[in-house]
């Protein structure tokens, strides 16, 4: 994300986890986010910095919680292992409800019978790497 001063920031969307490149539905998820962010002014609410130096943030466009929208549209999972420790309760409830809705409607990545969560995909990739 580029700020109003022209500085670029690496941002990780707070409390969601999207499919990794090479994983089913990754391109659709990425492209959906790109469409939302292209030529849009977004409000960034930084909550933390992760171990990779990325700003962890909520993104908003015209009042729309983009992170929540990614979950609602089946483009990401609610990252509950982190969220249950850090996310405000009202946001946690909204994100959990959005994921339940997307699952029930078989929206986006939930159209697959048993989509593999990105954290499990990463673990598989790490385990498959020769030591």
Regions found by a protein language model. Give the residues of each.
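Small beta-barrel nucleic-acid-binding modules, primarily SNase/OB-fold domains
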Residues: 1-131
């Amino acid at each position: 994300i580029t700020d109003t001063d022209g500085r670029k920031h690496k941002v990780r969307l707070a409390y969601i986890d999207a499919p990794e490149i090479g994983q089913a539905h990754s391109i659709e998820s990425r492209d959906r986010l790109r469409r939302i962010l292209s030529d849009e002014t977004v409000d960034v609410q930084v909550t933390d910095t992760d171990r990779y130096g990325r700003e962890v943030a909520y993104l908003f466009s015209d009042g729309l919680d983009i992170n929540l929208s990614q979950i609602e549209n089946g483009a990401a999972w609610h990252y509950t292992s982190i969220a249950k420790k850090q996310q405000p309760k009202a946001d946690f409830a909204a994100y959990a409800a959005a994921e339940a809705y997307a699952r029930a409607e078989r929206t986006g990545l939930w159209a697959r019978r048993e989509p593999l969560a990105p954290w499990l995909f990463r673990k598989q990739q790490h385990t498959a790497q020769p030591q």
